[in-house]
Amino acid sequence: MRKSVIFFMMLFVINMVCHAQGRTAVGQEETVSEFHVDTALVVRMRYVATAVGPAMIHFADSIAMLHGGKVTPVNYKSFQSTIRKCNQEKVQANEINDLVRCTIACPYDSLHSMITDLVQTAKKKGIFKKYKHQSYLDRGYWGDMVILNHGMVTSEIQIKSFYMAYANLDVNMVDFLGEDVCTKIKNETGLESGMSHHYYEIIRDVTGKYSWEDKEKAIEENTKYLQCFWEDYEKGTKFY
């Protein structure tokens, strides 16, 4: 079972790299890539995203404060990350949901009310686009996203429990979650925060900096790491 999980995850990584480099994915017929990213559109959409960021953060803060949540600073996708995602998904920059995003972390028991409030309030304001739940059983990861429509650009609000945020986010965790929450999670798990983000950066690398052996090891280590938060994960059903 363990070997099959690693095999399919490595296949996913190989295909992701192939898409990013404009090559044929494993199991597909050889084709010549005709896709070209409109870099001028990338520049324009990133500029528009900077105008949307403050409104998204204000909206997220207004809901999070009602449910004991904490909001990360706004995150704008970099030029290179935007190009990479366009190539991977064969879309232009105006089709990407997360040019601007933030994350709300809250106690597990507040997730349902938080997400319901986000969705319903966004609908009332006419900015709701969609809700999405992600669950990766083999990696012990789950998370929820509310996508907002701001006209020319969309924004993404990720919603995680304190535990999943502790495992996944690349932020100063004490500043974000507070010392009491971080100490509690670290005492329970014995683990440092943010290691899943570290492993993910290795897994998704397309520059050649890491070998396939490095990526396979990162997948194994990431799975072990996230399984230490398994009790929290098993509760992670769809919340809305």
Name these PLM-found stretches.
Residues G22-C86:
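Intrinsically disordered, low-complexity polar/charged tails and linkers
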Residues C86-Y240:
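Long beta-strand-rich cores associated with HINT superfamily self-processing modules
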Residues V5-I6, V26, T207:
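Sequence-pattern detector for short linear motifs
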Residues F12, A55-L66, M114-T121:
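Generic, well-ordered alpha-helical scaffold segments in large soluble proteins
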